[in-house]
């Protein structure tokens, strides 16, 4: 984590929790109007990571380990607040994505949809690979 933060540490805030339950207790203690939703990423998710309107400002994105994913109680909490997103993979040949890849895909899709910089974004655009312009 320290290496990944490079020289951006002054711009961010990192808090380490002993367990998911400790995190959830911390999250519940935040004033409800400022808390945001819990959104998990899992191969068991029912909604695509790039589904329209999948993210809102203030969302907390949860990623689990490559082996075990997010804890079962996190699935329950996320379903109740923000849902569970799925990043598609070919499960016949791939068990899971590397955690850093999943985080990159999820975070940048959330930023694209929320568009906090005020740039216009065409959420209907989907590249047509293999077709000539």
Range-by-range predicted roles:
Residues 2-133:
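Post-transcriptional modification and biogenesis factors for structured RNAs
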